[in-house]
Amino acid sequence: MDLKEYFENSVGLGILSTADANGNVDSAIYANPHVTGEDTIALIMRPRLSLDNIQHNPKAVYMYIEKGPGYQGRRLYLEKTALEEDPETVNQFRRSSHGDTGGESQAKLVYFKVTRIRPLVGDGE
């Protein structure tokens, strides 16, 4: 699947699920990921629970629910590969500016390897 094409041509809602080192789970709404390679994405993450969890447990799932009838979308299984803290680099990835609504200046760019892709519903195998 061409992730760049998929996210450029889809409208929907993204949810990132993470867990801390003890397995305590969190889910949060996220914008479409930045596709940086064939199997690599990046997300801008503010200093909140999801970012803290990723620092202690590199695995996550990004669930994307396409807008429209039925249950269409994808689940991307992720593993953190890098974290960029330079504000100028982070800002280069921003699609829009909403002002600093809390933590924007402390946001990080987190890179993930996509280890598996499944449909929104079912096993897809």
Could you describe each region identified by the protein language model?
Residues 1-125:
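Binding-site signature for planar aromatic cofactors or substrates
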